[in-house]
Amino acid sequence: MSVALPIPETVRSFLAHSHGLLIDGAWRAAASGQTLTTEDPATGAVIGHIAAGGQVDVDAAVRAADRALRERAWRTMPPPERMRLLWALADLIERDAEPLAFLESLDNGMPLALARFSVAGAASSLRYNAGWAGRISGEVPTLSAPDHHAYTVYEPVGVVGAIIPWNLPLTMAANKIGPAIAAGCTLVLKPAELTSLTAIWLGELVIEAGFPRGAVNIVTGRGAEAGAALAVHPLVAKISFTGSTATGQAIASAAVSTLKRVTLELGGKSPVFIFPDADLDAAAVGAANGIFLNSGQVCVAGSRLYAHRAVFDRIVEAVAGHADALSLGPGTAPTTQIGPLVSAGQKQRVEGFLADGLRDGCTYVAGGGTPEGPGYFVRPTVLAGAQPNMSVYCEEIFGPVLTVMPFEEDDLEALAARANDTRYGLAANIWTRDISRAHRLARLIDAGTIRVNGAGIDHALPFGGFKQSGWGRENGREGVLAHMELKSIAIRF
């Protein structure tokens, strides 16, 4: 296993402090005085302390956001000024890119290369959404009454409660802040308790960028306390949540009490299809990267691989070889290609699925088990023999576990029916040179995002899921509109 780099002095200095909550433009301790520890998942060692915000702190943060929203300076701020704030924040992220990437890797376990990519993605997300400030406009419809004139306008929905997961913390924070500010909202950001450190650093940059007091508030703490309080607060107009389907269901239920607007980006069990005419080398690498990236802790991870029988053995051998060749180690080690899972609990969850799979009749093609030593590592694993009634086939594992299944039918409807036999519908990947086939299969798959031949996900593309993979869309124009209300104004003259 590779050896971690020494912690840079800037990061070491940051970790030496016990971090508070950003409320109304200033840092404060939690009202309870309680703190939470945060660990390096590569070793299990405590690396820092964060404030354990609770209901009282959430209330203070929401009220600060509500005051900021209603202040004339924010209500009348020209859209180019909101754009400038988001660009300034993106510039500061890029300035601090290296310490942020190291901190993200240390806190989450992801390899440094991925952490650097994630930090860059956070900056680009803010810049993309900044471009929408001032570009959302209403319409002037033609009315039936000749002496009437009417128009529509979009207005900010209000205070946004943004709850983010632990798998890509900084990117997720930026994805929530950008569209909310572009739309003219204020917000309270609640990071995952396991990975709050880069969100706290981001809070310092929010202050430095010149955001008005209360426009962006950050409350760390347990989801069952701080997150739950945010979901039911009467002054929160919208909840934007990314995380598990189970937690999303609980948040949706809580939000019903005040009929909040809700956007949910939830779990997935995404299929990957490889046809004989595909670029098989590229498809095998794409399938491997699609499940083993960030140790499989990605919502769109391609965790079910369907390869045509004619190329099945070749594809499975290539993907298994890729899995076995990956270098495990601490995320902060320069040679690491796959880091630890985020926590002991997540490791136990993945190990439980693997045990269930073996008990149900699956066999290891690659990986399996955990290496000796400290940390929350699980070897990248390829399982054969999975059936639709098995948990490894139908449940989101959120770990480096791929099930492989052959298909023989040329009937795309039958193939799509197999893939759609799940409660999830977030994404899918298709590998074929037959573009007609790709279009036809893409239309048959119940998923919000379909990628063909390794196409990427862009900030301009609306992103979200079908079925129990979520409500609404993030990214693109739709992502900004999700933070706005549409008002109709009619005038008789």
Label each region the model flagged.
Residues I47-S137:
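Glycine-rich loop-to-alpha-helix module at the N-terminal edge of alpha/beta enzyme cores
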Residues R67-R70, D91-E98, G109, G131-R135, ...:
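Generic secondary-structure signature for well-ordered alpha-helical cores
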Residues A45-G48, V236, S327, R359, ...:
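Conserved C-terminal structural/oligomerization subdomain of aldehyde/semialdehyde dehydrogenase
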Residues G138-A282:
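Rossmann-like NAD(P) dinucleotide-binding subdomain of oxidoreductase/dehydrogenase enzymes
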Residues V46-G53, R70-W74, A162, V272-I274, ...:
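Short, well-ordered beta-strand elements within core beta-sheets of diverse protein domains
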Residues M1-I50, R84, A88, G138-I163, ...:
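Terminal low-complexity tails and localization/encapsulation signals of metabolic enzymes
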Residues G44, R82, E104, L126, ...:
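Residue-level signal for inorganic ion chemistry
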Residues K238, A246-Q387, D410-E413, V452:
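ALDH superfamily catalytic-core signature
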